[in-house]
Structure formats: C-alpha cells, structure tokens
Regions:
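Anionic-ligand binding region
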Residues: 141-178
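N-terminal active-site segment of His-dependent metallophosphoesterases
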Residues: 1-56, 231
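Beta-strand-turn-beta hairpins that frame and shape the catalytic cleft
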Residues: 1-4, 114-124, 172-177, 205
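Active-site neighborhood of phospho(di)ester-bond hydrolases with catalytic His/Asp-centered motifs
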Residues: 6-7, 32-37, 59-64, 126, ...
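Acidic, His/Gly-rich catalytic cores of divalent-metal-dependent hydrolytic chemistry
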Residues: 170-249
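Active-site neighborhood of divalent metal-dependent phosphoester bond hydrolases
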Residues: 48-49, 55-114, 121, 137-155
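Glycine-rich phosphate-binding loop signature in dinucleotide/nucleotide-binding domains
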Residues: 23-29, 55, 117-119, 152-155, ...
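Active-site environment of divalent metal-dependent phosphoester hydrolases
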Residues: 10-15, 40-43, 65-70, 158-171, ...
Length: 249
C-alpha cells in the first residue's frame, strides 16, 4: 500500500503538477490524501480542484482557508494590511469557486480522514492538528508537553497534518506526527513544494518527506495573468519574502 499525502495547494496548479509528476516518478501510489487549503490565496483554484478530483483514488479533508471561503470566517490576525489583503483574496476565491460550481463541494469537506494500514496501524489525517483545522498547528515551537497533549486520546498511531507550511517528522509518546509541509505558498528559505510518501505493508510502514522544485517565475506570471486582486500579497511567497514567526529575528 502506497499513499501520497499533500496539503496546502492554495490554488497553484503549477506546483501541484510538479508534485504529481514526482509521485509518478516514484512509481505512483494507491491513494492520495489531501489535507486541505486547496483553493484560497492562489491564482487558479478551479484547475487545482479539477486536477485533484480526477485522480484515480483520493480523499480530502478541509483546511481553515477552505472554511473561510465558504463561511466568510477570517483569520484572527492583527496586521490590518494583511487583513484587507486576505479579505480581498478570499472574496475573489469565493466568487471563482461559486461560478465554477465548486462551492457546495468545498463546503462539504470533512474535518478529518482515517485509514487502517495493512499492519493494523491507525492513520489520522487532519489539516492543522487533531480536532481542528486552524490555530498554531504542529510547528517547531511546540514543546514536548504541548505535542503530547495534541495526540492524547486520538485513537491513531500515525498523524498527518499540514497548515504551517513547514515539514516536520516528530514523535509524541507512541504516536508519529508528520507535517507534510505545503505544495504552494512556501516559507523561505526552502521554496520547494513538499509532501509525504507512505509505504505500508503487513510488517509495518515508513514515511518519506519529499521536496520538489517547480517554476516559481511561471507562478508569478500566472498570478499577474489571472488579474488577482492582491498579486503582491501572493507573489511574496514565491520570491522568498515570507518567513514563519519562529524564523523572524
């Protein structure tokens, strides 16, 4: 049994296509698990949804930005300029997916996915952390105690998350926690896409985090070509201008 676990595609089919090509180059998989943040803060949400739903076998759960697009909720941030940029971007995406006939599909995405691996191990896939699609997520600043609290009583041996755009492979007690990073909208300094491959059989399983390069200048050009309302806000990711809070001086 082979799985590819992706998250945070953010309306970027160029990055998604690069990851799908890498999966094929690794011999393909039996199923894709996609952990949300599919459409917002990107230039072509419809193509991303078409690509993903055309895969032979694929499961989805929602991310916080998928929920924002559908419900009108917004992130709890204090930077007023970022608030305005995000509001404009989410509104544009909402109109785009509504016109394309995907609004109801997006709104029906579940909070989590579960799978049983061949050796009996229990897999849980969520966007941010068990029980939530939002918040700080699984990030390098979490203490061992905080990490253990996240996985207490979750009925899983292997947990996959995204949300923070920062790949991590951690263990809390007997639970393996893998943050697959993001397909798009990367934090500096490593601007490549990331995802995870799972190899599972009757005797156990292994997880491999992979990095994939793609044409970021083509993404920048596509953002301009899409007449997105906040091009500068999006382009910053692909020029390496964004760093997470734990990397800022």
């Amino acid at each position: 049994m082979r799985l590819a676990v992706l998250s945070d595609i953010h309306g970027n089919p160029i990055a998604l296509d690069a990851v799908l090509a890498d999966v094929a180059g690794q011999g393909g998989v039996d199923e894709y698990l996609v952990l949300g943040d599919l459409v917002a803060l990107g230039y072509d949400p419809i193509t991303v949804l078409q690509r993903l739903t055309s895969l032979p076998k694929v499961g989805f759960n929602r991310g916080n930005t998928d929920r924002y697009v559908v419900t009108g909720d917004r992130p709890a941030i204090t930077d007023q300029e970022a608030v305005i940029e995000m509001a404009n971007s989410f509104s544009w995406t909402q109109g785009y997916v509504t016109a394309g006939g995907w609004f109801d599909w997006l709104g029906a995405l579940p909070l989590e996915q579960r799978r049983a691996l061949p050796d009996g191990s229990r897999l849980l896939a969520v966007h941010a952390a068990p029980g939530t699609d939002d918040g700080p997520g699984v990030n390098p600043e979490l203490s061992d105690t905080e990490l253990l609290q996240l996985v207490t009583d979750i009925d899983a041996d292997l947990v996959f998350v995204g949300h923070t755009h920062w790949p991590l492979d951690l263990t809390a007690g007997r639970v393996r926690i893998v943050n697959v990073g993001s397909v798009s909208n990367p934090w500096a300094p490593d601007l490549r896409a990331s995802y995870a491959l799972v190899e599972a059989g009757p005797s156990g399983w292994s997880v491999h985090l992979r990095r994939v390069d793609y044409d970021r200048q083509a993404v920048i050009n596509a953002i301009h070509g899409a007449h997105h309302p906040t091009p500068g806000f999006l382009i910053g990711w692909f020029r390496g201008e964004r760093r997470p809070s734990w990397q800022r001086g």
